[in-house]
Swiss-Prot record:
The gene is fumC. Pathway: Carbohydrate metabolism; tricarboxylic acid cycle; (S)-malate from fumarate: step 1/1. InterPro entries: Fum_hydII, Fumarase/histidase_N, Fumarase_C_C, Fumarate_lyase_CS, Fumarate_lyase_fam, Fumarate_lyase_N, L-Aspartase-like. Homotetramer. This is Fumarate hydratase class II. There are 2 substrate-binding sites: the catalytic A site, and the non-catalytic B site that may play a role in the transfer of substrate or product between the active site and the solvent. Alternatively, the B site may bind allosteric effectors. The lineage of its organism: Bacteria, Pseudomonadati, Campylobacterota, Epsilonproteobacteria, Campylobacterales.
Amino acid sequence: MQFRIEHDTMGEIKVNDSQYWGAQTQRSLENFKIGTEKMPKELIGAFAKLKRSLAVVNHKLGKLSLEKSQAIIKACDCILKGELCGEFPLAIWQTGSGTQTNMNLNEVIANKATEILGGNFREKKLIHPNDDVNMSQSSNDTFPTAMHIVSVLEITHRLLPSLENLLKTFKEKSQQFKEIVKIGRTHLQDATPLTLGQEFSGYASMLEHSKQQILESLEHLRELAIGGTAVGTGLNAHKELSEKVAEELSQFSGVKFVSAPNKFHALTSHDAIAYAHGAFKALAANLMKIANDIRWLASGPRCGLGELNIPENEPGSSIMPGKVNPTQCEAMTMVAVQVMGNDTAIGIAASQGNFELNVFKPVIIYNFLQSLRLLSDSMESFNIHCASGIEPNREKIDYYLHHSLMLVTALNPHVGYENAAKIAKNAHKKGISLKESALELKLLSAEDFDKFVVPEKMIGPKA
């Protein structure tokens, strides 16, 4: 391996000659050999979009030459095309402002841009990482800006489409199952009837609410910290920079961004991300409930509830032949647990904004993006391999419906609550039907029982 000598304000350091990064990236590699968690590639892409937009705006504001601006833009485009994916090796366990990752971008872009201009960055840098690529910026405003950019883009292009697909499936199932009357359950005990379609409409409504909560959180994430520089005052930045960068980013990405109205808030608080992740946690709670319901309703095949049949995707046991497990449900419930854990980490980290800067930024965005990725992937997997293939087991559904003691609830208006309870308890004690119990207790005639206890008429309010 060949090395070259790079330098920064702390002196010289050896860098692998095949890499584009410079001294500060190398120091971070050597000083923070912690864990395996690296800066997410999605965040690097958001950073490249930001640096690209800044190069455009700094030229328009007369601060950066056209030649340098175009070279930086082309270098950023190389990153966005995936041509430099091996140049961003830093751990998330670094400075809490993300300074080393900001400089990683600056160094790689500067050296690539120098090359684009026909220079040799090993001998002389035609583009400076701080003076040109980082012009009018601080890590303190670029990193939180990149956090918001990647959050908005990933929610828009990844999370919401997956959520929409699963929501569509449950809406379709709700219609498909609307005529199937089944017994309801509360407290894990038998309750009054409803339709399977009504049950699935509840799942669809949960996901619709989660979607709206996430969309609402997006409006806060659109606000960008750029232009605040070191502490929020905008020192060394043009007064029009923040607005113009938001406009340029919006145009380039096709997604709306705006300048944060208060940069002091934008640098020291990550309440927008904590709020958005709160919506992720609420979605995770809904997914946990849905997955648990489905795996319980599909339990069996002979000794469980067995009201639903789910797709058989793979063998379920290494010792029990023929066993098939609700694996998609299990995977999604584990994802939900991870998201809830991430929410705790993000909430604690977001509370640590001391004075003018929060210095827990890398761990916040790492956990945020992990949750987003897991939720997106698990919903897509669950939809394709489980939800879309759910079918009712009519025989089991009808059996439970007509053997439930809670059908006695329909008798409340006719014999009163206490007498209805006597009918149910007597039936349960003697192992007889509700009808037989009512006749034995002489509380109803057979004709009246058949008229009052009709499960199909118990699935909604009466006029």
